[in-house]
């Protein structure tokens, strides 16, 4: 969904000058680099979408008054898609100071500029919008869903976490294989942040996919639960049939007919539920009556086996059936 979000927010109209400044500052901080060429500062920002690059080029001119060139780099090598480089040569040193890339003495600033860090809520939103356009990604809703931004260093990461905090968004700075990242994992927080960025269509798509996944996961859990219960019930019925068979062997002819009849039903219909066994009885019985008769049959046989010193009704059961040693 990354491309959809970037496409949407790169076309978002922003009228407040402070917000446009904050967004440009963030894009240059997270996607840019400073180079010294013949003693002068040259600024470059490399982006992965043409819309974001054109937006940056326009704002640099309209807000800061500097011209820039847009260079398209075709896919090749490790680059899977085209890359778009916005380069400012004339006035690069002035733009670097205006956007907070360097301080008044020309020393690099590693985080976000003070006017963004201490600005209004809209500036925090704009900073996040710029950072996401520069190096953001959004994964599909799921167990490992996340919205994250790759940062040029820990100072920029902490500044972005602070901006998220001002928006009441829980974000964490992490270093993964030597790369600083800011990550938002909570599904509700991701939806709230996308709304703050102005990606309203993307929020709807995100929430729809998230809901669909949750419904599917719930259905799978219920299906697994039902399957497990069915398997457990089937094993229990088979185990009960094996115990009844052993009980009738132990008691031989010395067993009341109504108990023997219930036992024979269990043996003849090993997969049937107690309710189904009751319906098959003549006359029909309730499931509690069937269960009671089978319990009494087993108890009588186990007592006789104990008196005779022989194996009881559990003798015919395997390990799994012993674990499910129920009537049915």
UniProtKB/Swiss-Prot annotation:
Location of the DNA-binding region in this protein: 273-306
A Gene Ontology molecular function term of the record: DNA binding
Keywords: Activator, Cell cycle, Cell division, DNA-binding, Repressor, Transcription, Transcription regulation
Knocked-out gene: effects: Cells lacking this gene do not sporulate; instead of aerial hyphae of unicellular spores, long slightly coiled unseptated stalks form.
Cited Pfam families: HTH_WhiA (PF02650), LAGLIDADG_WhiA (PF14527), WhiA_N (PF10298)
UniProt domain comment: DNA binding is primarily driven by the H-T-H domain, but requires full-length protein for maximum affinity.
Function: Involved in cell division and chromosome segregation. Involved in sporulation. May coordinate the cessation of aerial hyphae growth and subsequent chromosome segregation and/or septation. Required for expression of the ParB partioning protein during sporogenesis. Activates its own transcription and represses WhiB. Binds with low affinity to its own promoter and to the Parp2 sporulation-specific promoter. Also binds directly to the RNA polymerase sigma factor WhiG, leading to inhibition of WhiG-dependent transcription in a dose-dependent manner.
Subunit relationships: Monomer in solution.
Name under which the protein is recorded: Probable cell division protein WhiA
Species: Streptomyces coelicolor (strain ATCC BAA-471 / A3(2) / M145)
Classification lineage: Bacteria, Bacillati, Actinomycetota, Actinomycetes, Kitasatosporales
């Amino acid at each position: 969904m990354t491309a959809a979000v970037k496409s949407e927010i790169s076309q978002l109209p922003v009228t407040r000058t402070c917000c446009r400044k904050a967004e440009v500052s963030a894009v240059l901080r997270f996607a840019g680099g400073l180079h010294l060429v013949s003693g002068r500062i040259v600024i470059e920002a490399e982006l992965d979408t043409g819309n974001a690059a054109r937006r940056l080029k326009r704002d640099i001119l309209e807000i800061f008054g500097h011209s820039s060139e847009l260079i398209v780099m075709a896919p090749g090598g490790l680059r899977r898609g085209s890359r778009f480089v916005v380069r400012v040569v004339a006035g690069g040193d002035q733009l670097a100071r205006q956007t907070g890339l360097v301080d008044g003495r020309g020393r690099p600033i590693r985080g976000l500029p003070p006017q963004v860090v201490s600005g209004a809520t809209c500036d925090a939103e704009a900073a996040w919008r710029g950072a996401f356009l520069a190096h953001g990604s959004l994964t599909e809703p799921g167990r490992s869903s996340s919205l994250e931004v790759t940062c040029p260093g820990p100072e920029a990461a902490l500044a972005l976490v602070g901006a998220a905090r001002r928006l009441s968004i829980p974000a964490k700075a992490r270093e993964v294989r030597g790369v600083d990242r800011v990550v938002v994992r909570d599904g509700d927080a991701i939806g709230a942040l996308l709304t703050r960025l102005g990606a309203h269509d993307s929020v709807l798509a995100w929430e729809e996919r998230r809901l669909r996944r949750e419904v599917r996961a719930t259905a799978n859990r219920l299906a697994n639960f039902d399957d497990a219960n069915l398997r457990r019930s089937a094993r229990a019925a088979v185990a009960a049939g094996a115990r009844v068979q052993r009980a009738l062997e132990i008691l031989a002819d010395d067993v009341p007919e109504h108990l023997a009849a219930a036992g024979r039903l269990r043996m003849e219909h090993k997969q049937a539920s107690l309710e189904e066994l009751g319906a098959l009885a003549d006359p029909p019985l309730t499931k509690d009556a069937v269960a009671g008769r089978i319990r009494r049959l087993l108890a009588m046989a186990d007592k006789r086996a104990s008196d005779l010193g022989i194996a009881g009704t559990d003798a015919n059961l395997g390990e799994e059936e012993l674990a499910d040693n129920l009537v049915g």
